[in-house]
Amino acid sequence: VREPTFFDRNHPGWLRYTLTDVFRLSQYLGIPFFPPNPDPIVQDMATRTIATDQPYIYRITRMGQAAARKGKSLAFCDEVSQLIWGGTANWHEGDHLKHAAERAGLDLAELDAIAASDAEALDAELAANQEALEMAGHWGVPTLVFQGEPFFGQDRIGLAIWRMEQAGLKERG
């Protein structure tokens, strides 16, 4: 959605390999991982075309940014991503998101209200985050940046921590 031509620019086999690799990695790490139901990004997987109407992704990204304003974006994203990718069918219905928000120390009704009433500002903040990501030297997620040095991918989190420790940072207790 951030990059509508993403799939057009990649090798046709990229998505198949990536999904194979992600499932393999989840098994290796012992992390539950299932195809999202529904996928937060509505798209035709056969043609790799991203739909114009996106009923899920804008809501959850705006709520994630609203959570960031409260200093709880990582907790919110962790809980919601476990719903989406952890096998919860119809994660967007019922109380699934409500309970995920509560586990993150947030109120879903409040996040939804902010996402609806302040959508333009939230979208601008998300666009600024995208610009900052590119200015840091990368374009994908997840990317961590420490002292101007980008670390792309979950497999680089340990490397980013190592670099922070080199700079004298200590883990908070």
Residue ranges and their predicted role:
Residues V1-I84:
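Structural alpha/beta surface segment adjacent to cysteine/selenocysteine redox centers
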Residues C77-G173:
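C-terminal cap of thioredoxin/glutaredoxin-like
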